Amino acid sequence: MALRTLSTFPSLPRRHTTTRREPNLTVIYRNPTTSIVCKSIANSEPPVSLSERDGFAAAAPTPGERFLENQRAHEAQKVVKKEIKKEKKKKKEEIIARKVVDTSVSCCYGCGAPLQTSDVDSPGFVDLVTYELKKKHHQLRTMICGRCQLLSHGHMITAVGGNGGYPGGKQFVSADELREKLSHLRHEKALIVKLVDIVDFNGSFLARVRDLVGANPIILVITKIDLLPKGTDMNCIGDWVVEVTMRKKLNVLSVHLTSSKSLDGVSGVASEIQKEKKGRDVYILGAANVGKSAFINALLKTMAERDPVAAAAQKYKPIQSAVPGTTLGPIQINAFVGGEKLYDTPGVHLHHRQAAVVHSDDLPALAPQNRLRGQSFDISTLPTQSSSSPKGESLNGYTFFWGGLVRIDILKALPETCFTFYGPKALEIHAVPTKTATAFYEKELGVLLTPPSGKNQMQEWKGLQSHRLLQIEINDAKRPASDVAISGLGWISIEPIRKTRGTEPRDLNEAEHEIHICVSVPKPVEVFLRPTLPIGTSGTEWYQYRELTDKEEEVRPKWYF
């Protein structure tokens, strides 16, 4: 058989064209009446037009050209990202550069204020001769300013003004400036130890602490538990604190109940810090006057038993006083063997606490010094409203004054309802008929009703301008209905039916399931309605632990004492 060549096959009707893209096989579709079109299996591009096929249009970019174009775009994108990252890093460095603990500026080890020799009345002042001598021997870090020396001897010298500051006295720095000194914490890896005063739990809680510290881990420390009444079960207190903290949606590593005075619970905090710091600096943070400096002194004393570095740090420890705003700048303390730093920070000054509205001379009256003993008032302890209205019928129509700072009008209550006040002893409580309450307040303000006290304080006093109506629901007559907490002062426990020896609370009818009161305080002091704090021996009897699911048990922080 003769060998067939390409010429022996019939001629194609039209020349066939292959696509210009490679490398897959080409499928040829034959039809005697139509053109032969070549289509690549791997590409879904539309067929090439006749003009392009015959060379009358611009050639499509080759794969190599497309690759180079993509590479150039990728490189340009990398440059832009690098510039953005560089800008962010620059801003972060600027924020951290504002960190007040500057080694080039020596600060008073008592309050953190920069040392200066020009203004005698300002924080940080030291004698020029002493300053030059200490500077010559490189001992400026061992200096304490004149203000701290006066504070250590009991003088009340405020230095903070502005929103959240304190009226009266000299105001050298604003509360906003002190908050700005803590702004770097959001951009820095640190371990935060947040302090809350148990006597002013709601007022000192710092619910928006994440705005200051970002995502840094937090250890929650409750201070001044030695002020709680005798017989208080710390198991109940710890569970109550954890429950309230979870309701406020604040995630913490653990909760610790402490007393800087008796050192109770401080060793547990020291162990937790050593466990969780992991090379990070440790910052003690909290509202003004919650006891940060006192807690640091107790912490150093506890750590010094095993750590020689902490023992050496005790020589120059922060000053502690009853004046809110004692600390005016972060104080660096070399307290750890690993080289991490411990910082005492300026208190966060809150405008909604009583300390922000009273005169600086009256600030000591707001701080409880001894264990709290509640002052209880029921119908048997109140005066009669008139000779025609015998005592013992109802609490309705009476008004309580808590010093000159709080007024409580009872609008609806049960005859057996009891109000128990927990706060500083310096503020006396007076009960009068509501119809004479306004006249009584105007007459006795500054005399029986203090603070405010003194002529100057009276002139600056703006009165009780904020009023809040509270409707308290009674779910169980055998336990207190609720606490009314006054920010920066204390709280009032409301017991629907006071329990007496040998008697049981009676059953309530449908009309007796609410208590209505009106609380008046100075602007902008806040009033909180919260679950009753289980204090004293009676708290152990009525407090109920909530049953937890497995998931709740897993995420719930542990508490220690």
From Swiss-Prot:
> Which part of the chain is the CP-type G domain?
175-351
* Transit peptide as recorded in UniProt: 1-31
What are its GO biological-process terms? Answer: leaf development; nitric oxide biosynthetic process; plastid organization; regulation of isopentenyl diphosphate biosynthetic process, methylerythritol 4-phosphate pathway; regulation of protein metabolic process; response to oxidative stress; response to ozone; response to salt stress
The EC number of this protein is: 1.14.13.39
State one molecular function term (GO): oxidoreductase activity
Which Pfam families does its entry note? MMR_HSR1, YqeH-like_C
Transmembrane spans: none
InterPro entries for the chain: G_CP_dom (IPR030378), GTP-bd (IPR006073), NOA1 (IPR044229), NOA1/YqeH-like_C (IPR048422), P-loop_NTPase (IPR027417)
Positions annotated to bind GTP = 108-111, 166-174, 223-226, 260-261, 289-294
Q: What is the reported tissue distribution?
A: Expressed in aleurone layer and the embryo.
Q: Where in the cell is it found?
A: Mitochondrion; Plastid, Chloroplast
State its role: Exhibits cGTPase activity; binds and hydrolyzes specifically GTP. May participate in ribosome assembly and stability and thus regulates protein synthesis in chloroplasts. The GTPase activity requires MgCl(2)and the presence of either KCl or (NH(4))(2)SO(4). Involved in the post-transcriptional regulation of the methylerythritol phosphate (MEP) pathway. Involved in chlorophyll-a fluorescence regulation.
What protein family is recorded? Belongs to the TRAFAC class YlqF/YawG GTPase family. NOA1 subfamily.
Q: What is this protein called?
A: NO-associated protein 1, chloroplastic/mitochondrial
Q: Which organism is it from?
A: Arabidopsis thaliana
